[in-house]
């Protein structure tokens, strides 16, 4: 049980690391169920949870101020969502995936959910504008030359 709790605590963050394994068909079914079972609000909370813990890193800590109370509340909401997905909405898919593909399926399935949640975030107009602002600083000529040289 401790192993399951530890895995569940880190699984969403898995999308930021290189994938060590691909999910099989049962893991795919589990991931699809998890995405279907979450609302846009749930996925926004997942991104908030990820952000709250990334913001603890010394290299980015000065960019965001998240109170301990907010972090505790996000932990509770993420734990509630995790339990709901694993033991209620996607219980059958979770059982089968773990039985056939092992505990690693938790990492890959929650990684899919995390990626979908982040994609939702990037669909926001303000985020798109911020990315557009970034691209103004790129040297398009050099990029075109690089692409042409790669052909």
Residues of each region from the PLM?
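Bacterial N-terminal signal peptides
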Residues: 6-16
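N-terminal secretory signal peptides
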Residues: 23-75
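Short, basic/polar N-terminal leader/transit segment immediately after the initiator methionine
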Residues: 3-6, 25-26
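Compact alpha-helical subdomains of small soluble proteins
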Residues: 54, 58-64, 68-151
């Amino acid at each position: 049980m401790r192993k399951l709790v530890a895995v569940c605590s880190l699984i969403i963050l898995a999308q930021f690391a290189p994938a060590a394994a691909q999910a099989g068909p049962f893991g795919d079914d589990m991931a699809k169920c998890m995405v279907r079972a979450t609302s846009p609000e749930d996925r926004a909370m997942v991104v908030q949870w990820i952000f709250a813990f990334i913001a603890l890193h010394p290299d980015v800590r000065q960019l965001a101020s998240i109170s301990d109370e907010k972090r505790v509340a996000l932990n509770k909401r993420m734990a509630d969502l995790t339990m709901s997905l694993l033991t209620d909405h996607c219980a059958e898919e979770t059982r089968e995936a773990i039985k056939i593909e092992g505990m690693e399926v938790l990492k890959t399935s929650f990684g899919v959910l995390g990626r979908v949640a982040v994609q939702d975030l990037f669909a926001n107009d303000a985020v798109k504008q911020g990315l557009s602002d970034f691209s103004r600083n790129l040297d398009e000529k050099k990029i075109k030359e690089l692409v042409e040289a790669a052909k």
